[in-house]
């Protein structure tokens, strides 16, 4: 994957496609951050994001900002991640590019939960769940339901947690080897049933 990101950057630079060159830089940065080279990854993500903004493009901007936020999470920069997610959510509202809205809200909820803001986190999980259901985006719905179920479990509301997550998990007929479904299944097993 890293080689492909390098190829995108090389071809885009050679052919004069700044949009694709910037996107390639951001994907390269995300891969580096995800694979432990966090400082270099964040630097590449910032460079790519600046280059992308310079093209005037806004499509996929929330996605790229979310990648930078995740890299900042890895580095322990929760406050920076929250600022980035707020920026991405503002772009979603302004442009109507809502396909990632549920995941952005869920991610923000996770970070607020880490800071001890339980009520705000729960509200964002509910918002993410509502958006995912409205869009019929089952993966985002699963992630939001799992996050909310974990919170409810931690609050001692195990039956509610199971009742929330079980039907969403039950919708899936394949992909059970994916990380999201494995984690949902493990949580359901812990809660007493799938």
Question: What spans do the regions from the language model cover?
Answer:
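Helix-coil-helix junctions within alpha-helical repeat/solenoid scaffolds
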Residues: 1-194
């Amino acid at each position: 994957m890293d080689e492909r990101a390098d190829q995108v950057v090389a071809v885009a630079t050679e052919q004069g496609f700044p949009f694709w060159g910037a996107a390639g830089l951001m994907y390269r940065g995300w891969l580096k951050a995800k694979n432990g080279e966090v400082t270099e990854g964040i630097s590449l993500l910032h460079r790519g994001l600046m280059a992308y903004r310079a093209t005037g493009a806004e499509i996929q901007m929330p996605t790229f900002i979310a990648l930078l936020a995740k890299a900042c999470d890895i580095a322990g920069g929760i406050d920076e991640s929250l600022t980035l997610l707020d920026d991405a959510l503002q772009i979603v509202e302004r442009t109507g590019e809502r396909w990632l809205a549920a995941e952005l809200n869920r991610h923000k909820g996770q970070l607020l939960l880490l800071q001890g803001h339980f009520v705000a986190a729960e509200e964002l999980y509910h918002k993410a769940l509502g958006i995912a259901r409205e869009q019929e985006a089952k993966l985002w719905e699963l992630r939001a339901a799992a996050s909310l179920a974990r919170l409810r479990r931690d609050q001692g509301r195990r039956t509610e947690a199971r009742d929330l997550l079980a039907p969403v998990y039950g919708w899936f007929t394949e992909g059970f080897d994916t990380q999201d479904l494995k984690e949902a299944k493990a949580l359901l097993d812990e809660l007493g049933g799938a």
